Regions:
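Surface-exposed, interaction-prone regions used to assemble/regulate multi-protein complexes
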Residues: 1-126
Length: 126
């Protein structure tokens, strides 16, 4: 995900990003966030609820943003930092899977899925 570019922003009852890397290690990653999360831009943090479409308008500017790093923490948090200083932070939800990250890694197309579990924790498939 690091060094990748956001090629798609998806808005429905959740918020999604598709991130592509174009170097020799070409990879594709999709993030889907289903619960409230923090969006930081210009030093200001906003809590966004994907169930309220009007709150997601500022996220459209993430299209073509460069990703500095993205990682999941064992306690169920997901963090994505962008090169321009923006960030997305997702905390675990007590009742629902708060986020899912899926993708493919080279050199052999190897698919994976990470899921932020209800309560705390992360599940890895693949």
């Amino acid at each position: 995900m690091a060094g990748g570019e956001v090629t798609q922003v998806q808005i429905d009852y959740a918020f999604g990003l598709t991130i592509e890397t174009y170097d020799e290690q070409r990879a594709s990653t999709h993030i889907r966030i289903s619960t409230r999360f923090e969006y930081e831009a210009n030093g200001e943090v906003t809590v966004i609820d994907p169930g309220h479409t009007e709150q997601m308008a500022p996220l459209l500017t993430l299209h073509k943003a460069a990703v500095a790093e993205g990682y999941a923490i064992k306690d169920g948090h997901l963090v994505v930092h962008f090169v321009d200083g923006r960030a997305i932070r997702v905390a675990p939800d007590e009742q629902y899977e708060s986020w899912t990250v899926t993708g493919q890694l080279p050199p052999v197309v190897r698919k994976f899925s990470l899921i932020g579990l209800p309560g705390t924790g992360v599940a890895l498939f693949g």
